[in-house]
């Protein structure tokens, strides 16, 4: 299988940089996969799990939004947050969700709407990790 260069960058770190076979991305308009030779595209990323396949091995990375750009040079993802699932403390993640739920009653209007959307994303990520991310 042909490979291509992939960079995953967050404000804190370069989370991944190297040659890969495929990257599956949680796009705002729907999930999509990138292979070598993919047509150029820029897409908004929604919070979810990004899957990197290289040399037959998969690495799953939680991203909390960002931008993906496919060009002739490869794929670059600028993520708001990027953390490998293997490095994620699931107890802390669950505690964050519980805190978000407890804070909902004090919010109204657009702030409430954004908080509910963010909570839904976190719960979706938690569900994906518990059901598929380690397979």
From Swiss-Prot:
Membrane-topology descriptor: Peripheral membrane protein
Keyword Cell inner membrane: yes
Pfam families (UniProt xref): ATP-synt_DE_N
Entry's localization field: Cell inner membrane
Keywords, alphabetical: ATP synthesis, Cell inner membrane, Cell membrane, CF(1), Hydrogen ion transport, Ion transport, Membrane, Transport
Keyword Iron-sulfur in record: no
MF (Gene Ontology): ATP binding; proton-transporting ATP synthase activity, rotational mechanism
Gene Ontology, cellular component aspect: plasma membrane; proton-transporting ATP synthase complex
Chief subcellular location: membrane
Superkingdom field: Bacteria
Family statement: Belongs to the ATPase epsilon chain family.
Subunit structure: F-type ATPases have 2 components, CF(1) - the catalytic core - and CF(0) - the membrane proton channel. CF(1) has five subunits: alpha(3), beta(3), gamma(1), delta(1), epsilon(1). CF(0) has three main subunits: a, b and c.
Function description: Produces ATP from ADP in the presence of a proton gradient across the membrane.
Protein name from the UniProt record: ATP synthase epsilon chain
Organism: Rhodopseudomonas palustris (strain BisB5)
């Amino acid at each position: 299988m042909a490979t291509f260069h992939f960079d995953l960058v967050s404000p804190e770190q370069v989370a991944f940089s190297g040659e890969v076979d495929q990257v599956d991305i949680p796009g705002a308009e729907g999930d999509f996969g990138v292979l070598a030779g993919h047509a150029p595209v820029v897409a908004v990323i929604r919070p979810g799990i990004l899957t990197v396949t290289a040399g037959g091995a998969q690495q799953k990375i939680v991203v909390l939004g960002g931008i993906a750009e496919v060009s002739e040079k490869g794929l670059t993802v600028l993520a708001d947050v990027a953390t490998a699932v293997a490095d994620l403390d699931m107890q802390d993640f669950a505690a964050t969700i519980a805190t978000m739920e407890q804070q909902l009653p004090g919010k109204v209007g657009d702030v409430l709407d954004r908080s509910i959307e963010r909570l839904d994303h976190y719960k979706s990520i938690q569900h994906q990790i518990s059901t598929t991310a380690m397979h």
